[in-house]
């Protein structure tokens, strides 16, 4: 999916940064990833409060197959097709995705600094 198209699509939401990752791209507002692009589909971050709205729209969560052949489910849901033509409502959904991403990041414990082993 073209980066200019994504920026135009999210223009009413605000400045979106796109970072390539794992064959797709992450959608960022500042340092917070609130969405992703995979196989030309956009997915937005959801939590227990916002996931039901995606379910009502019959949207599926993002899944991938691990290196061990298991299917992994992530808390990103496919953007409803109708939002591609409604920038105002898309901006609302994007703000909710950003709030869910911030809430999820706040729940995570801070990462431990890696220590170097002493050579013997």
Where are these regions (language model features)?
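Charge-dense, helix-prone N-terminal extensions
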Residues: 1-120
């Amino acid at each position: 999916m073209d980066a200019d198209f994504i920026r135009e699509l999210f223009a009413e939401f605000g400045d979106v940064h796109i970072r390539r990752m794992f064959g797709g791209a992450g959608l960022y507002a500042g340092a917070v990833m609130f969405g992703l692009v995979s196989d030309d589909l956009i997915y937005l971050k959801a939590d227990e409060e916002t996931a039901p709205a995606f379910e009502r729209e019959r949207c599926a969560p993002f899944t991938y197959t691990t290196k061990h052949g298991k299917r992994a489910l992530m808390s990103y849901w496919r953007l409803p097709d109708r939002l591609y033509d409604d920038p105002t409502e898309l901006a609302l959904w994007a703000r909710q995705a950003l709030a869910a991403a911030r809430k999820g990041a706040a729940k995570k414990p801070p990462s431990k600094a890696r220590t170097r082993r002493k050579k013997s």
